[in-house]
């Protein structure tokens, strides 16, 4: 697999896995409006995943977005560890969403300038959706943080719990570095300042605290995932595994 294919696959996997997680909220959100909002955000991410995975399949010269989504094993997925974390309670979902939304906005803003026209076009469409997603997640971060004692406590606990996965957002490997030097990709290390400016401001507005430095978790890009991804994929891929190639 060449570097551009691998890079595009990472972007698609992030969107696909997070979309699946948000879909698990359908019918279970705290209120109908939130249920619809999470479902719509999940559908936006699914659309982004289709665009990235379709392009990855085109670059690879085989398969399509369905092949990549439904026939790969856990170790073949290269998504960030953050997006595969369980929904938990509503505060957990909001913290996870806010962290990735802030990163997506920073990433797609830069990736629109990619020398690869397809990546630039996908990002130009995705940035509009990502900005809406960020408004939603930051809005709820502030509501929960400034709400009751219980909601504020749950929001702080969610931030503390998921903070260890945020360092991977800025972890650069040889693929990131090589493609960024060619003007195709974005070096994730250069996204930290924009992400921290947004996230620190959001946490401050929510009257919450930025967690202290801690032992961070990485490895998703290399296919080294937490125990949560495998069961999620088993459910997501079940039908194609049982009835390969079937259409409906």
Swiss-Prot record:
<dbReference type="Pfam" id="PF05138">
    <property type="entry name" value="PaaA_PaaC"/>
</dbReference>
<dbReference type="InterPro" id="IPR009078">
    <property type="entry name" value="Ferritin-like_SF"/>
</dbReference>
<dbReference type="InterPro" id="IPR011882">
    <property type="entry name" value="PaaC"/>
</dbReference>
<comment type="subunit">
    <text>Forms a stable heterotetramer (dimer of heterodimers) with PaaA and a stable heterodimer with PaaB.</text>
</comment>
<comment type="pathway">
    <text>Aromatic compound metabolism; phenylacetate degradation.</text>
</comment>
<protein>
    <recommendedName>
        <fullName>1,2-phenylacetyl-CoA epoxidase, subunit C</fullName>
    </recommendedName>
</protein>
<dbReference type="InterPro" id="IPR007814">
    <property type="entry name" value="PaaA_PaaC"/>
</dbReference>
<dbReference type="GO" id="GO:0005829">
    <property type="term" value="C:cytosol"/>
</dbReference>
<dbReference type="InterPro" id="IPR052703">
    <property type="entry name" value="Aromatic_CoA_ox/epox"/>
</dbReference>
<feature type="binding site">
    <location>
        <begin position="76"/>
        <end position="79"/>
    </location>
    <ligand>
        <name>substrate</name>
    </ligand>
</feature>
<comment type="function">
    <text>Component of 1,2-phenylacetyl-CoA epoxidase multicomponent enzyme system which catalyzes the reduction of phenylacetyl-CoA (PA-CoA) to form 1,2-epoxyphenylacetyl-CoA. The subunit C may be essential for structural integrity of the alpha subunit.</text>
</comment>
<dbReference type="GO" id="GO:0010124">
    <property type="term" value="P:phenylacetate catabolic process"/>
</dbReference>
<dbReference type="InterPro" id="IPR012347">
    <property type="entry name" value="Ferritin-like"/>
</dbReference>
<dbReference type="GO" id="GO:0062077">
    <property type="term" value="C:phenylacetyl-CoA 1,2-epoxidase complex"/>
</dbReference>
<feature type="binding site">
    <location>
        <begin position="177"/>
        <end position="179"/>
    </location>
    <ligand>
        <name>substrate</name>
    </ligand>
</feature>
């Amino acid at each position: 697999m060449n570097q551009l294919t691998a890079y595009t696959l990472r972007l698609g996997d992030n969107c696909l896995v997070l979309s699946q997680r948000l879909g698990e909220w359908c019918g279970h959100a705290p209120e109908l409006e939130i249920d619809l909002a999470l479902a719509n955000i999940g559908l936006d991410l699914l659309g982004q995943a289709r665009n990235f995975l379709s392009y990855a399949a085109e670059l690879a010269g085989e398969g399509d977005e369905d092949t990549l989504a439904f026939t790969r094993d856990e170790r073949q997925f290269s998504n960030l560890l953050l997006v595969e974390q369980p929904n938990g309670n509503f505060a957990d979902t909001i913290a996870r969403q806010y962290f990735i939304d802030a990163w997506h906005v920073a990433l797609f803003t830069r990736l629109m300038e990619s020398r690869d026209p397809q990546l630039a076009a996908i990002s130009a469409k995705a940035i509009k959706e990502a900005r809406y997603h960020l408004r939603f997640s930051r809005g709820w971060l502030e509501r929960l943080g400034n709400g009751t004692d219980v909601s504020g406590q749950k929001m702080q606990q969610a931030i503390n719990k998921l903070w260890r996965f945020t360092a991977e957002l800025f972890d650069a490997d040889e693929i990131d570095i090589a493609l960024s030097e060619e003007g195709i990709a974005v070096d994730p290390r250069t996204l930290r300042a924009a992400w921290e400016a947004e996230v620190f401001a959001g946490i401050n507005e929510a009257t919450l605290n930025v967690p202290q430095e801690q032992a961070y978790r990485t490895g998703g890009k290399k296919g080294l995932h937490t125990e949560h991804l495998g069961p999620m994929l088993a459910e997501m891929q079940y039908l194609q595994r049982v009835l390969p190639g079937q259409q409906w």
